[in-house]
UniProtKB/Swiss-Prot annotation:
Source taxon at top rank: Bacteria
One GO cellular component, as annotated: plasma membrane
Keywords per UniProt: Cell membrane, Membrane, Repeat, Transmembrane, Transmembrane helix, Transport
Pfam families per record: MIP
Reaction it catalyzes: glycerol(in) = glycerol(out)
Protein name (record): Probable glycerol uptake facilitator protein
Membrane-crossing segments per the record: 13-33, 51-71, 104-124, 162-182, 195-215, 244-264
Length: 264
């Protein structure tokens, strides 16, 4: 959602994406840490997938609300969502130049800066969580610590792992697109962030036990890098899998962006 008319608006928009992603990871991975790390009171709780699904849904709502309060239209908090809007917007600009009010160069500058902000926000949030929960991290095996940072597949299979993340991201983006189309029918009166909250909650319930449902490159790669850089004994960031939660969501956003721009 790019509501930028000139470069003077970029800093506030980028700052909103940074803070939105920061609070997304702080809330989402914070909840995951409560459920996974040793000596946490919630470690032995039941229905962990359900708890994680609702926690991440609320984390998305928090991130979107905070970002949008700083800059109306911000709140992508996901490089794949930002790329979808950039791809579809660029093609729409080429096909229908009279109906789009932003320049293509500004759009792609905004995209690159948004990505930097989203990854930086995710990494800073994870670094803060590691500081807060370090005593628990020290008493937890490194593979369990890894899943408090990023996603890991239950069974490593490149084609199926990639397809799972691709499909889940496609559902997310399509849901946001369809929800936005109801604006003329006053659907937009619901608080911004409610639709992605519900969609993410449902996606984690549907796909989370297989791949963890990253559907967001910043959410996965940013904290994974923090894990890699942290002084955790016998750590393994699972780099052979790390490209899938990045490439699959971005591939879905490009393909959907092209289809939407050309067909819709």
């Amino acid at each position: 959602m790019f509501n930028l008319s000139d470069f003077s608006e970029l800093p506030r928009w980028i700052g909103a994406e940074f803070l939105g992603t920061f609070f997304l990871i702080l809330s989402g991975n914070g909840a995951g840490s409560q459920l996974t790390l040793n000596k946490m009171f919630a470690k032995e709780s039941k229905a962990k997938l359900l708890t994680a699904a609702f926690a991440w849904g609320i984390a998305v709502l928090v991130g979107v609300l905070i970002a949008n309060s700083l800059f109306e239209g911000a709140g992508n908090i996901n490089p794949a969502v930002s790329l979808f809007y950039a791809v579809s917007g660029t093609i729409q600009k080429a096909l229908y130049p009279l109906h789009v009010n932003f320049s293509i160069p500004l759009l792609w500058v905004a995209l690159l800066l948004a990505w930097v902000a989203q990854f930086a926000g995710a990494m800073l949030a994870q670094a803060l969580l590691n500081f807060l929960f370090w005593k628990h991290i020290e008493q937890t095996d490194p593979q369990s610590v890894l899943v408090t940072h990023c996603t890991n597949p239950a069974i490593f299979n490149i084609p199926r792992n990639f397809a799972t993340e691709f499909v889940a991201t496609s559902v997310l983006i399509a849901s946001l697109l369809v929800a936005g189309s109801f604006g003329a029918n006053r659907f937009d009166q619901s608080p911004r962030g409610v639709v992605p909250m519900l969609v993410v909650t449902g996606l984690i319930m549907s796909f989370g036990a297989a791949t963890g449902t990253a559907i967001n490159p910043a959410r996965d790669l940013g904290p994974r890098i923090v894990y890699w850089l942290s002084p955790i004994k016998n750590k393994d960031p699972n780099l052979k899998y790390s490209w899938i939660p990045v490439a699959a969501p971005l591939s879905a956003s490009v393909i959907l962006g092209v289809l939407v721009a050309v067909i819709v």
